[in-house]
Amino acid sequence: MSRLTAEAISLSFEQRGQRRAILRDLSLGLAKGESLVVLGPSGCGKSTLLNILAGFQKPDQGRVQIDGRTLEGPGGERGVVFQDDALMPWLNALDNVALGLRIRGLGKAERTARARQVLQLVGLQEYAEQSVAQLSGGQRQRLGLARALAVEPDFLLLDEPFGALDALTRERMQVLLLDLWKQTGKGLFLITHSVDEALFLATDLVVMDGPPARIVKRLPVDFARRYAAGETVRSIKADPEFGRLRQALLDEFLDVAEAEHAH
C-alpha cells in the first residue's frame, strides 16, 4: 500500500537578522485509505508542513518520500486543495478541471471525459459550462476537489479547505469529502483549527503547536470509519465519546494557551 512520509523535517527562515525555526525535526506519515488530520492553532506551522509535503517548499533538513522514493517537487501522486480555491475565473467549471489534464498531455477527448467524470463525482455535472463567478463558495470548493481528483493522485492534501464556508455548507463538504474518501480509497492529509472537523474526518489525529511546530499528541480516531461503514452524522456527533474527545482536545488547547500566557 502506497505511503507518504515526512522524515525529520526542519525549516527556518531569516527574520530581523535571526534564524526563526518553523519546523524542527518533525516526522509523520500516512498510507492510502487513511485520513491524517493535523489540528492546531493558526501560525503553528501546519500550512508550511503541507507545502513541504506537496513539494511547493523544500525543507532545510529531512525528506519527503513515497514508498521510499524521495520527492523533489510537486507530482501527480499528490493533489492539493486550498482554502482559497485558486480557480481560473476566465474558464468554466469543465475547463478548470481539464486544465491540469492538458498540462499532463492528455488529448482533448480524454481530458473532457475525465473532467466530466470527476464533476459528476462531486455533484457538479450540471454546472460544467458555468463560469466560476456563477458558483457559490461551496460549489467552488467542490470544483477545487474535482480538479485535484482529476489527475488521479494517491493522496489529497487539503489546507483548511472549508474554513471560509458557512457552518451548514462546511458540514456538507465534510460529508462529501468522506464520501469521496470511501469511494476512492485515497489517502487524506488535512489541516484544520476546528476540533469538530478534525474528529469527524480523521482516522489518525495529530495535535500540533508551535512555532517551531511540534506534535503535542497523536491519537487514532474511528468516527470517519464509522461514517464510511454507514453510521449517520447525527448518530456519530451525538456519541458521548465524540463529546468527551472534543472537550479533552479543547482543554489541551486551553492548557497550552495558559502556559504561554504565563510566560
Curated annotation (Swiss-Prot):
Primary role: Part of the ABC transporter complex TauABC involved in taurine import. Responsible for energy coupling to the transport system.
Pfam families: ABC_tran (PF00005)
Domain of life: Bacteria
Assembly and interaction partners: The complex is composed of two ATP-binding proteins (TauB), two transmembrane proteins (TauC) and a solute-binding protein (TauA).
ABC transporter domain: residues covered: 4-235
Species of provenance: Pseudomonas aeruginosa (strain ATCC 15692 / DSM 22644 / CIP 104116 / JCM 14847 / LMG 12228 / 1C / PRS 101 / PAO1)
Binding-site residues for ATP, renumbered to this chain: 40-47
A GO term, aspect molecular function: ABC-type taurine transporter transporter activity
Identification of the protein by name: Taurine import ATP-binding protein TauB
